[in-house]
């Protein structure tokens, strides 16, 4: 037995730690295949955190067919206009993000819906290069394994829309007292633009800036036909 391997074998605690870390790294890629099954309703790491802290949360799973198309269109135009055309990562956007960072300029988020879904399902919420490095391969894998419809369905059912409010059905009921299937274009656009910061941006009580931004997204959503074909064709 080589000396290096013998050194490792003689340290059972270190061996267990390494194996545990490897299992945690591999587990998300295994779970992605389980999420192919439509009757499995994934939860996010934020939901698990709320359970551990005994806060509880409101999430009511609905299928994509039970969600207003206006909401899907608004979220795509607000969060990821190239959703139907990339493979999980918008590399052109990522390149500009890296260039801005190297220049010391303020950066945009650069996260696609698959990247946000991977983060919500498997990673933590704070921004860091370590998290982003883990997020990229998970996003590509998620986009490759899941259909665009299934991926969108999962995203809209785990996204945070306020303290303890997860998923579009709970958000629609909480902010507008209607089911997700009955959201108007204005309500849908308000929910969409609140996604980047749902704690500070209240879709049910929007300020002037949020209403103005929602108006922009509402107009984009109305002309989004070519951009949403992977969802509704």
Curated annotation (Swiss-Prot):
The chain crosses the membrane at residues 17-37. One of its GO terms (molecular function) is peptidoglycan glycosyltransferase activity. Keywords: Cell inner membrane, Cell membrane, Cell shape, Cell wall biogenesis/degradation, Glycosyltransferase, Membrane, Peptidoglycan synthesis, Transferase, Transmembrane, Transmembrane helix. Pfam families: Transgly (PF00912). Pathway: Cell wall biogenesis; peptidoglycan biosynthesis. GO terms for biological process: cell wall organization; peptidoglycan biosynthetic process; regulation of cell shape. It comes from the Bacteria. It is an enzyme of class 2 (transferase). The keyword Glycosyltransferase applies. Its main location: membrane. Its EC number is 2.4.99.28. It catalyses: [GlcNAc-(1->4)-Mur2Ac(oyl-L-Ala-gamma-D-Glu-L-Lys-D-Ala-D-Ala)](n)-di-trans,octa-cis-undecaprenyl diphosphate + beta-D-GlcNAc-(1->4)-Mur2Ac(oyl-L-Ala-gamma-D-Glu-L-Lys-D-Ala-D-Ala)-di-trans,octa-cis-undecaprenyl diphosphate = [GlcNAc-(1->4)-Mur2Ac(oyl-L-Ala-gamma-D-Glu-L-Lys-D-Ala-D-Ala)](n+1)-di-trans,octa-cis-undecaprenyl diphosphate + di-trans,octa-cis-undecaprenyl diphosphate + H(+). Disulfide bonds: none annotated. It is a single-pass membrane protein. GO terms for cellular component: peptidoglycan-based cell wall; plasma membrane. It is found in: Cell inner membrane. PANTHER family: BIOSYNTHETIC PEPTIDOGLYCAN TRANSGLYCOSYLASE (PTHR30400:SF0), MONOFUNCTIONAL BIOSYNTHETIC PEPTIDOGLYCAN TRANSGLYCOSYLASE (PTHR30400). HAMAP family: PGT_MtgA (MF_00766). Peptidoglycan polymerase that catalyzes glycan chain elongation from lipid-linked precursors. NCBIfam families: mono_pep_trsgly. Belongs to the glycosyltransferase 51 family. This is Biosynthetic peptidoglycan transglycosylase. It comes from Rhizobium etli (strain CIAT 652). The lineage of its organism: Bacteria, Pseudomonadati, Pseudomonadota, Alphaproteobacteria, Hyphomicrobiales. The gene is mtgA.
């Amino acid at each position: 037995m080589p000396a290096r391997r013998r050194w490792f074998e003689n340290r059972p605690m270190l061996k267990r730690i390494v194996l545990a870390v490897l299992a945690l790294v591999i587990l998300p890629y295994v779970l992605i295949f389980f999420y192919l099954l439509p009757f499995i309703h994934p939860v996010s790491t934020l939901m698990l955190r709320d359970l551990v802290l005994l806060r509880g949360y409101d999430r009511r799973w609905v299928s994509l067919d039970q969600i207003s198309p206006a909401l899907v269109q608004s979220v795509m135009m607000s969060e990821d206009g190239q959703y139907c055309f990339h493979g999980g990562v918008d590399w052109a956007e990522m390149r500009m993000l890296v260039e801005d960072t190297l220049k010391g300029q303020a950066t945009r988020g650069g996260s696609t819906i698959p990247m946000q879904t991977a983060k919500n399902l498997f990673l933590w919420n704070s921004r860091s290069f370590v998290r982003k490095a883990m997020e990229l391969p998970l996003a590509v894998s998620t986009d490759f394994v899941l259909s665009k419809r299934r991926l969108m369905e999962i995203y809209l059912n785990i996204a945070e829309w306020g303290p303890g409010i997860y998923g579009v059905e709970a958000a629609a009921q909480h902010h507008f007292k209607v089911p997700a299937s009955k959201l108007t274009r204005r309500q849908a656009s308000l929910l969409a633009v609140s996604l980047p910061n749902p704690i500070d941006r209240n879709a049910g009580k929007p300020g002037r800036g949020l209403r103005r931004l929602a108006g922009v997204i509402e107009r984009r959503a109305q002309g989004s036909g070519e951009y949403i074909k992977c969802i509704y064709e």
